[in-house]
Amino acid sequence: MANHKSAAKRARQSIRKTAVNNARKSTVKTAEKKLVKAIEAKDLKALPELLKNFSSQVMKAAKTGVIKKETASRKISRLSTRASATK
């Protein structure tokens, strides 16, 4: 338990931010799973939209500091390469 008002506030903020960050990570993982599933199924119709959505989610996570920018770039690069190889 925090002894100072400011410490209590920081604890509340930490809980809220953790929830937001976990939600963002979850959306990134879900988008990644959908994209990988489409790549493995060779679903060429859904692939461009899923890749666009995945890239968007990953860059939003990187922009807000949930994941590192290098990690985001690596994920996008690898999955883009896999997606283009299925065509």
Curated annotation (Swiss-Prot):
Disulfide bonds: none annotated. The keyword Oxidoreductase does not apply. The keyword Hydrolase does not apply. Residues 19-29 have a biased composition (Polar residues). Residues 1-29 are annotated as: Disordered. Residues 1-15 have a biased composition (Basic residues). One of its GO terms (biological process) is translation. Keywords: Ribonucleoprotein, Ribosomal protein, RNA-binding, rRNA-binding. One of its GO terms (molecular function) is structural constituent of ribosome. SUPFAM superfamilies: Ribosomal protein S20. InterPro entries: Ribosomal_bS20, Ribosomal_bS20_sf. GO terms for cellular component: small ribosomal subunit. Belongs to the bacterial ribosomal protein bS20 family. Binds directly to 16S ribosomal RNA. This is Small ribosomal subunit protein bS20. It comes from Bdellovibrio bacteriovorus (strain ATCC 15356 / DSM 50701 / NCIMB 9529 / HD100). The lineage of its organism: Bacteria, Pseudomonadati, Bdellovibrionota, Bdellovibrionia, Bdellovibrionales.
